[in-house]
């Protein structure tokens, strides 16, 4: 079973991805799939925090992310933040957009999750929790070259 990175490992990795993303107008070398930057407001602190996340696009052109935290036992902090305040900022490519984070449920959640996890649900094998799927309402459909067409994992 693959190990889940520590919080410090996540922070160090994320800082590098964020810096590269902003320096190159949304293009990064790692991870090996398209990413966006999600900025949430801290539920307790009120401080704005940014994380890089893999994303997917559904058939209706909606951009969404999965709160997997690499299969860790707890939801990522950014998910708790957007549950407290659904207003988020999304950086995608060279653009920045104000959006509303909508946590999906039931059949919609399951359908969207299957699109990114496919049959290889390795992250889910590490934990008993259900990974939340969040639609970022207000983010325009990215250019076709940024679509994730194969199952990918998100942060």
Regions found by a protein language model. Give the residues of each.
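C-terminal edge-of-domain segments
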Residues: 2, 122-155
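Extreme N-terminal tail/first-helix region
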Residues: 1-30, 143, 155
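Short beta-strand segments
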Residues: 32-68
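Generic, well-ordered alpha-helical segments
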Residues: 13, 30, 46-47, 70, ...
